[in-house]
Curated annotation (Swiss-Prot):
Organism in which the protein naturally occurs: Ureaplasma parvum serovar 3 (strain ATCC 700970)
Source organism superkingdom: Bacteria
Name the record gives this protein: Uncharacterized protein UU151
């Protein structure tokens, strides 16, 4: 299960990086992306990815 979680986390990180690269053409967008990146790292560091994703999906 842990390997699956790590694989999924890595997939999300890669998708985020791809998105970030597409959006950083504008300075304001880059600033927002940097903030999102910091938040994402904090969530990842605290091992709360699954919980956060579940919460986000509840509000979509």
């Amino acid at each position: 299960m842990k390997n699956q979680n790590e694989k999924q986390i890595k997939e999300y990180v890669n998708k985020f990086k791809d998105l970030r690269n597409q959006l950083t053409k504008n300075n304001d967008v880059k600033k927002v992306c940097d903030l999102i990146n910091d938040l994402f790292f904090e969530v990842y560091k605290n091992n709360l990815i699954d919980e956060v994703i579940k919460e986000i999906n509840k509000h979509d």
